Amino acid sequence: MKSAFKSEFPFEKRKAESERIVQKFHNRIPVICERGGKSDIPDIDKRKYLVPGDLTVGQFVYVIRKRIKLPAEKAIFIFVNDTLPPTAALMSSIYQHHKDKDGFLYVSYSSENTFGGAGPLLEK
């Protein structure tokens, strides 16, 4: 899925912003979170996050769920590079292995597991 954030801002601007963020907030990770293509979950009110490195993927999902006011009975899945990251993985580890060339970690969310299952996200 093509990121709307990437479409809106040129690479140089995104890279400069992520470098500034990482320099200013050493223990934070710059994350762009956008709704996946055909999801019926509402759009999120903001897509840029500064996430603590010691936050787990499961805790990040909780934050996203709260931001979009998703009822408990509705499922939500998040994807990094079209793969489900392990719930217990630290965001710092996911960032280390999967950050974009511009320095941001791109995460998409959906109401369906559209990519079929968890993959080897931490093996590289």
Swiss-Prot record:
UniProt membrane topology term: Lipid-anchor
Localization (cell): Cytoplasmic vesicle, Cvt vesicle membrane; Cytoplasmic vesicle, Autophagosome membrane; Vacuole membrane
Assembly description: Conjugation to phosphatidylethanolamine (PE) leads to homodimerization. Interacts with ATG1, ATG3, ATG4, ATG7 and ATG12.
Originating organism: Kluyveromyces marxianus (strain DMKU3-1042 / BCC 29191 / NBRC 104275) (Yeast)
Misc. remarks from the entry: Kluyveromyces marxianus proteins are shorter in length and have a more ordered secondary structure than their S.cerevisiae counterparts, which might contribute to the superior thermotolerance and solubility. K.marxianus could be therefore useful as a new model organism for further elucidation of the molecular details of autophagy.
Protein name: Autophagy-related protein 8
InterPro entries: Atg8-like, Ubiquitin-like_domsf
Modification after translation, per record: The C-terminal 8 residues of ATG8 are removed by ATG4 to expose Gly-116 at the C-terminus. This Gly-116 forms then a thioester bond with the 'Cys-550' of ATG7 (E1-like activating enzyme) before being transferred to the 'Cys-244' of ATG3 (the specific E2 conjugating enzyme), in order to be finally amidated with phosphatidylethanolamine. This lipid modification anchors ATG8 to membranes and can be reversed by ATG4, releasing soluble ATG8.
Keywords associated with the record: Autophagy, Cytoplasmic vesicle, Lipoprotein, Membrane, Protein transport, Transport, Vacuole
Keyword Electron transport included in the entry's annotation: no
Domain of life: Eukaryota
Gene ablation phenotype (knockout): Blocks autophagic activity by impairing the formation of autophagic bodies.
Lipidation (Phosphatidylethanolamine amidated glycine): 116
BP GO terms, sorted: autophagy; protein transport
Chain ranges passing through the membrane: none
Entry similarity comment: Belongs to the ATG8 family.
Record site feature (Cleavage), residues: 116-117
One Pfam family cited in the UniProt record for this chain: ATG8
Any one cellular-component term (Gene Ontology): Cvt vesicle membrane
Propeptide: 117-124
Functional summary from the UniProt entry: Ubiquitin-like modifier involved in cytoplasm to vacuole transport (Cvt) vesicles and autophagosome formation. With ATG4, mediates the delivery of the vesicles and autophagosomes to the vacuole via the microtubule cytoskeleton. Required for selective autophagic degradation of the nucleus (nucleophagy) as well as for mitophagy which contributes to regulate mitochondrial quantity and quality by eliminating the mitochondria to a basal level to fulfill cellular energy requirements and preventing excess ROS production.
Consequence when changing residue 116 to A: In Atg8FA; prevents conjugation with phosphatidylethanolamine (PE) and impairs the correct localization to autophagic membranes
